[in-house]
Amino acid sequence: MRSQSFVLSLLLFAVCLVVLSPAFADPTDAAGWVAAGQSLTAAGNYSAGELAYKQALILDPKNADAWNGIADVLNRAHKYTSDPLATMQMALEASNQSLALNASSPIAWINRGQILYNIGYYYQDQLKDPATANMYYNEQLDAFNQAISIDPNNAEAWFNKGYALCGIGRCTEGVAAFKKVEALDPSYPYLQLNLAQAEKLAGVETPFYIQYAGEIVMAVIAIAIAVIWYWAVRRKY
């Protein structure tokens, strides 16, 4: 009985080796290394993620997804480096490479927009250079618009556009972008929080005479009617 159990255990172990070993083996093609890079990046292992993407490029130097992966991982890792701006500039260069190979990827355009935002914020917050910051912020918006032109129903692109618009003081347009996200994906992460904030800021940026135009018109009409009634009554007496 014990011998049978031992044999069954060996067979089960052999089956596990056959089934599971490919999952633990190094990828053998560029697509596999890109997938590995994505998993490592999502797990926060940026150094290993970058190495995986570089391995993909060794196998396929014109792999647009690998270049976009490098752009993404460098953008995420910039705050942990000794020269954040240089790291973000390298991310932007990798984005250039990716889009030169495949300009029809909405994911790559969204990634580019996020890189441009981080560079702009660095110029604004660290270097106190609002003019250069605004240049990058506007380029960021262009990138998100490119993503939307390729995929009009991409909720992530619309969300980032809404965030970008509010960041440059165009919250009324930002509200419209967030409402588009709401129509596409009501459960999009942090949507309601950002929509509420955008609506609040849009109320501040809208002049009161526009914000309350309806009420003002009704008040003017009421006053006009009262004045007409007053003069009509006065003439009788």
Task: Please name every model-derived segment.
Residues 42-43, 76-77, 118, 125, ...:
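Register position in tetratricopeptide repeats
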